[in-house]
Amino acid sequence: MTDAELNARLRANLLGYRLLQARTGPLRMWERPGVWAFSLPGYEHSIFHHQVLYEDARALAEALAPLEAWYREQGVRDWRVPILPGDVAMEAVLARAGYQLEDVVPGMGLPLEHTPPRLPLGTTLEHPEQLDEVLALNTFFYGGTGVVHLEPWRTRLPARIHAVLIREADRALAGGLSFEQGDTAGIYLVATHPDAHRRGLGALVMRGLHADAYARGCTVAVLQATPMGHGLYRQLGYRELGAWRNWVRRTG
């Protein structure tokens, strides 16, 4: 599978993941054919929650003015548009419209196979039906505002969301989730407790997510890599798909 094909799957998975959040939680959504914008009320200054995803570059170019008007109506001054690797024409359009390149995030992909994790003595791998402990692990790194939009999932997982926890002595030490769409598993919210770093627990979570997704019929996993997780994903065999470039519009 080519990098372009995997990036297309990553884009579709990111969009499906956001659409699910909008349907089941507090995210607001603005939609035009081929363009979707998301915003979280009460967190107008947290740019992470104000994001535009697109499938059609021409549609996005034509939507920039009404998109800006919608964000202003929400009281949002800053938002971002992730651009797929190689879409230089769209980047030029955004630059002319006042957007600025702010950061770069690697996209990564991995063909799946059945390789269940080998757990260290005294640890268990669990499949929780709620996200409370996975969110708690993520707050160590992103704070409460980074996962507040997922509060409705804290006590009940929606369909197509599958979580994994590594537990030791009744403590949740690492966890993460996958969002599965078609035969593609998107990997999100993988985190390890600060007390359990350098024990390989993040890799165990990933292998658990991979094996479970494969058993459910997924053939590939995709993700956007944080600096903290990038090395781990490479060790697990993920292939780099190029840099996703976040263009930001700041109107404040």
What function would you assign to each model-found segment?
Residues 145-193:
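A conserved beta-strand-loop-helix scaffold within acyl/acetyltransferase catalytic domains
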Residues 60-69, 189-194, 198-215, 235:
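Conserved acetyl-CoA-binding loop-helix of GNAT-fold acetyltransferases
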Residues 87-101, 203, 227-244:
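Conserved active-site alpha-helix within GNAT-family acetyltransferase domains
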Residues 1-72:
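N-terminal charged segments
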Residues 56-131, 247-249:
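Acyl-donor-binding surface of acyltransferase catalytic domains
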Residues 74-84, 213-225:
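Conserved GNAT acetyl-CoA-binding A-motif
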Residues 28-34, 92-100, 160-176:
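Conserved beta-hairpin
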Residues 40-50, 102, 179-188, 197:
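A conserved beta-turn-beta hairpin within the catalytic core of GNAT-like acetyltransferases
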